[in-house]
Protein backbone atom coordinates (compact mmCIF):
# COMPACT_ATOMS: atom_id res chain seq x y z
CA UNK A 1 0.00 0.00 0.00
CA UNK A 2 1.76 3.12 -1.22
CA UNK A 3 0.45 6.57 -2.14
CA UNK A 4 1.47 10.20 -1.58
CA UNK A 5 0.54 11.49 1.89
CA UNK A 6 -3.10 12.52 2.10
CA UNK A 7 -4.52 15.39 4.12
CA UNK A 8 -7.54 14.27 6.13
CA UNK A 9 -10.09 16.75 7.51
CA UNK A 10 -11.98 15.55 10.57
CA UNK A 11 -15.59 16.75 10.21
CA UNK A 12 -18.91 16.53 12.03
CA UNK A 13 -21.16 18.32 9.53
CA UNK A 14 -21.83 18.55 5.80
CA UNK A 15 -20.78 22.21 5.78
CA UNK A 16 -17.45 21.22 7.32
CA UNK A 17 -16.98 18.59 4.62
CA UNK A 18 -17.73 21.09 1.85
CA UNK A 19 -15.29 23.60 3.30
CA UNK A 20 -12.64 20.92 3.79
CA UNK A 21 -12.75 19.95 0.13
CA UNK A 22 -12.74 23.62 -0.88
CA UNK A 23 -9.60 24.09 1.23
CA UNK A 24 -7.95 21.18 -0.57
CA UNK A 25 -8.38 18.20 1.76
CA UNK A 26 -7.96 14.83 0.07
CA UNK A 27 -10.23 12.90 2.44
CA UNK A 28 -12.83 13.72 5.09
CA UNK A 29 -13.02 11.72 8.29
CA UNK A 30 -16.60 11.64 9.51
CA UNK A 31 -16.48 11.37 13.29
CA UNK A 32 -19.82 9.63 13.66
CA UNK A 33 -19.35 9.46 17.43
CA UNK A 34 -19.16 13.28 17.62
CA UNK A 35 -22.05 14.11 15.31
CA UNK A 36 -24.66 13.89 18.05
CA UNK A 37 -27.50 13.31 15.61
CA UNK A 38 -27.97 11.34 12.43
CA UNK A 39 -24.43 10.13 11.83
CA UNK A 40 -25.41 7.62 9.15
CA UNK A 41 -27.42 10.30 7.38
CA UNK A 42 -24.40 12.61 7.39
CA UNK A 43 -22.13 9.96 5.87
CA UNK A 44 -24.66 9.20 3.13
CA UNK A 45 -25.20 12.90 2.44
CA UNK A 46 -21.47 13.57 2.06
CA UNK A 47 -21.13 10.50 -0.16
CA UNK A 48 -23.94 11.44 -2.53
CA UNK A 49 -23.80 15.25 -2.50
CA UNK A 50 -20.06 15.93 -2.21
CA UNK A 51 -18.58 12.70 -3.54
CA UNK A 52 -15.25 12.99 -1.72
CA UNK A 53 -13.30 10.10 -0.19
CA UNK A 54 -14.55 9.27 3.32
CA UNK A 55 -13.04 7.74 6.45
CA UNK A 56 -15.75 6.42 8.75
CA UNK A 57 -14.76 6.63 12.43
CA UNK A 58 -17.02 5.65 15.34
CA UNK A 59 -14.59 6.19 18.19
CA UNK A 60 -15.58 4.54 21.51
CA UNK A 61 -15.01 6.11 24.89
CA UNK A 62 -12.18 3.70 25.76
CA UNK A 63 -10.16 5.24 22.91
CA UNK A 64 -10.99 8.88 23.60
CA UNK A 65 -14.21 9.10 21.57
CA UNK A 66 -17.85 9.62 22.46
CA UNK A 67 -19.56 6.43 21.28
CA UNK A 68 -21.00 4.68 24.33
CA UNK A 69 -23.21 2.05 22.73
CA UNK A 70 -22.63 -1.68 22.75
CA UNK A 71 -20.13 -3.56 20.62
CA UNK A 72 -23.01 -5.07 18.65
CA UNK A 73 -24.48 -1.63 17.96
CA UNK A 74 -21.16 -0.37 16.66
CA UNK A 75 -20.78 -3.38 14.39
CA UNK A 76 -24.22 -2.70 12.92
CA UNK A 77 -23.36 0.97 12.39
CA UNK A 78 -20.19 0.04 10.53
CA UNK A 79 -22.09 -2.48 8.41
CA UNK A 80 -24.46 0.29 7.41
CA UNK A 81 -21.75 2.84 6.66
CA UNK A 82 -18.77 0.98 5.17
CA UNK A 83 -20.39 0.76 1.70
CA UNK A 84 -19.96 4.56 1.57
CA UNK A 85 -16.42 4.55 2.96
CA UNK A 86 -13.02 4.60 1.33
CA UNK A 87 -11.45 3.88 4.73
CA UNK A 88 -12.86 2.60 8.03
CA UNK A 89 -11.07 3.18 11.33
CA UNK A 90 -11.09 0.42 13.95
CA UNK A 91 -9.22 0.35 17.25
CA UNK A 92 -6.46 -2.18 17.86
CA UNK A 93 -7.67 -2.48 21.46
CA UNK A 94 -11.25 -3.28 20.48
CA UNK A 95 -12.13 -6.69 21.94
CA UNK A 96 -14.14 -7.48 18.80
CA UNK A 97 -11.59 -6.14 16.29
CA UNK A 98 -11.83 -9.16 14.01
CA UNK A 99 -15.61 -8.84 13.92
CA UNK A 100 -15.32 -5.13 13.14
CA UNK A 101 -12.96 -5.90 10.27
CA UNK A 102 -15.57 -8.17 8.69
CA UNK A 103 -17.83 -5.12 8.22
CA UNK A 104 -15.75 -4.04 5.22
CA UNK A 105 -16.11 -7.41 3.48
CA UNK A 106 -17.55 -6.88 0.02
CA UNK A 107 -16.78 -3.15 0.06
CA UNK A 108 -13.87 -1.12 -1.28
CA UNK A 109 -13.04 0.31 2.15
CA UNK A 110 -9.44 0.10 3.34
CA UNK A 111 -9.10 -0.64 7.06
CA UNK A 112 -7.19 1.65 9.40
CA UNK A 113 -6.33 -0.04 12.68
CA UNK A 114 -5.59 2.66 15.22
CA UNK A 115 -4.00 2.99 18.64
CA UNK A 116 -4.14 6.16 20.74
CA UNK A 117 -2.20 6.86 23.92
CA UNK A 118 -3.17 10.23 25.37
CA UNK A 119 -0.78 9.91 28.32
CA UNK A 120 2.63 8.93 26.98
CA UNK A 121 4.83 7.82 24.12
CA UNK A 122 5.52 4.08 24.49
CA UNK A 123 8.98 2.61 24.07
CA UNK A 124 10.30 2.12 20.55
CA UNK A 125 9.77 -1.62 20.89
CA UNK A 126 6.16 -1.12 21.96
CA UNK A 127 5.46 1.27 19.09
CA UNK A 128 6.91 -1.09 16.51
CA UNK A 129 4.84 -3.92 17.98
CA UNK A 130 1.67 -1.81 17.81
CA UNK A 131 2.34 -0.90 14.18
CA UNK A 132 3.12 -4.49 13.22
CA UNK A 133 0.00 -5.87 14.92
CA UNK A 134 -2.13 -3.27 13.16
CA UNK A 135 -0.62 -3.84 9.73
CA UNK A 136 -0.92 -7.62 10.14
CA UNK A 137 -4.69 -7.08 10.05
CA UNK A 138 -4.29 -5.93 6.45
CA UNK A 139 -4.59 -2.34 7.49
CA UNK A 140 -2.88 1.00 7.62
CA UNK A 141 -1.49 1.16 11.14
CA UNK A 142 -2.39 4.43 12.86
CA UNK A 143 -0.39 5.33 15.96
CA UNK A 144 -1.13 8.54 17.89
CA UNK A 145 0.80 9.17 21.10
CA UNK A 146 1.41 11.97 23.59
CA UNK A 147 4.99 13.23 24.04
CA UNK A 148 6.51 14.34 27.33
CA UNK A 149 9.45 16.04 25.59
CA UNK A 150 10.96 16.56 22.15
CA UNK A 151 12.86 13.29 22.41
CA UNK A 152 9.52 11.46 22.38
CA UNK A 153 8.57 13.24 19.15
CA UNK A 154 11.89 12.28 17.57
CA UNK A 155 11.44 8.66 18.63
CA UNK A 156 8.05 8.52 16.92
CA UNK A 157 9.52 9.93 13.70
CA UNK A 158 12.35 7.39 13.93
CA UNK A 159 9.83 4.56 14.25
CA UNK A 160 7.88 5.95 11.30
CA UNK A 161 11.00 5.83 9.15
CA UNK A 162 12.20 2.45 10.37
CA UNK A 163 8.90 0.60 10.24
CA UNK A 164 8.76 0.45 6.42
CA UNK A 165 5.06 -0.31 6.83
CA UNK A 166 1.88 1.50 5.71
CA UNK A 167 1.45 3.80 8.70
CA UNK A 168 -0.07 7.00 9.94
CA UNK A 169 1.85 8.38 12.91
CA UNK A 170 1.02 11.39 15.07
CA UNK A 171 2.68 12.96 18.07
CA UNK A 172 -0.19 14.82 19.72
CA UNK A 173 -0.48 18.08 21.61
CA UNK A 174 1.51 21.30 21.23
CA UNK A 175 4.87 19.54 21.67
CA UNK A 176 4.15 17.18 18.81
CA UNK A 177 2.20 19.55 16.58
CA UNK A 178 4.97 19.80 14.00
CA UNK A 179 4.86 16.01 13.54
CA UNK A 180 1.61 16.51 11.64
CA UNK A 181 3.66 18.31 9.01
CA UNK A 182 6.91 16.35 9.07
CA UNK A 183 5.78 12.75 9.75
CA UNK A 184 4.80 12.40 6.05
CA UNK A 185 8.45 13.11 5.18
CA UNK A 186 9.34 9.94 7.11
CA UNK A 187 6.60 7.79 5.58
CA UNK A 188 3.30 8.61 7.32
CA UNK A 189 0.52 8.17 4.74
CA UNK A 190 -2.15 10.33 6.38
CA UNK A 191 -2.10 13.59 8.32
CA UNK A 192 -5.20 14.89 10.08
CA UNK A 193 -6.32 18.52 10.22
CA UNK A 194 -9.43 20.48 11.05
CA UNK A 195 -11.79 22.97 9.39
CA UNK A 196 -13.53 24.86 12.21
CA UNK A 197 -12.11 23.44 15.42
CA UNK A 198 -9.66 20.65 16.31
CA UNK A 199 -11.09 17.27 17.28
CA UNK A 200 -7.73 16.00 18.57
CA UNK A 201 -4.93 17.74 20.49
CA UNK A 202 -2.48 19.58 18.25
CA UNK A 203 -4.42 19.41 14.99
CA UNK A 204 -3.56 22.05 12.37
CA UNK A 205 -6.05 23.69 10.02
CA UNK A 206 -6.29 21.90 6.67
CA UNK A 207 -5.09 24.78 4.49
CA UNK A 208 -2.07 25.32 6.74
CA UNK A 209 -1.21 21.61 6.55
CA UNK A 210 -1.36 21.75 2.77
CA UNK A 211 0.88 24.80 2.62
CA UNK A 212 3.40 23.10 4.88
CA UNK A 213 3.41 19.97 2.73
CA UNK A 214 3.95 22.11 -0.37
CA UNK A 215 6.95 23.78 1.24
CA UNK A 216 8.34 20.33 2.07
CA UNK A 217 7.83 19.18 -1.53
CA UNK A 218 5.11 16.65 -0.70
CA UNK A 219 2.36 18.27 -2.81
From Swiss-Prot:
Catalyzes what?
Answer: 3-dehydroquinate = 3-dehydroshikimate + H2O
Residue numbers annotated as active site: 116, 142
Give GO terms: molecular function aspect only.
3-dehydroquinate dehydratase activity
Entry's Gene Ontology BP terms: 3,4-dihydroxybenzoate biosynthetic process; amino acid biosynthetic process; aromatic amino acid family biosynthetic process; chorismate biosynthetic process
Q: Which InterPro entries match?
A: Aldolase_TIM, DHquinase_I, Type-I_3-dehydroquinase
A Pfam family in this protein?
A: DHquinase_I
Residues annotated as binding 3-dehydroquinate are 10, 29-31, 59, 180, 203
- EC no.? 4.2.1.10
Write down the top EC class of this protein: lyase
Carries keyword tRNA processing? no
Q: List the pathway annotation.
A: Metabolic intermediate biosynthesis; chorismate biosynthesis; chorismate from D-erythrose 4-phosphate and phosphoenolpyruvate: step 3/7
Which cysteines are cross-linked by disulfides?
none
Q: Which UniProt keywords apply?
A: Amino-acid biosynthesis, Aromatic amino acid biosynthesis, Lyase, Schiff base
- Assembly and interactions? Homodimer.
Known function: Involved in the third step of the chorismate pathway, which leads to the biosynthesis of aromatic amino acids. Catalyzes the cis-dehydration of 3-dehydroquinate (DHQ) and introduces the first double bond of the aromatic ring to yield 3-dehydroshikimate.
Family that this chain belongs to: Belongs to the type-I 3-dehydroquinase family.
Looking up PANTHER family in the UniProt record yields: 3-DEHYDROQUINATE DEHYDRATASE
Query: Which named protein is this?
Result: 3-dehydroquinate dehydratase
Recorded source organism is Methanocella arvoryzae (strain DSM 22066 / NBRC 105507 / MRE50)
Amino acid sequence: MDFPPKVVASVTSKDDAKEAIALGADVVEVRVDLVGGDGPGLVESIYYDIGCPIIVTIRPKFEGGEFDGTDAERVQLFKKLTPYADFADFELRAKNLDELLTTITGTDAVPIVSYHDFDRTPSNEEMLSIINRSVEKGAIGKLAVMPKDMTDVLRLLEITLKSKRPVCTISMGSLGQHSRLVAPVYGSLLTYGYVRRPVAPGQIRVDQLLEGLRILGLR
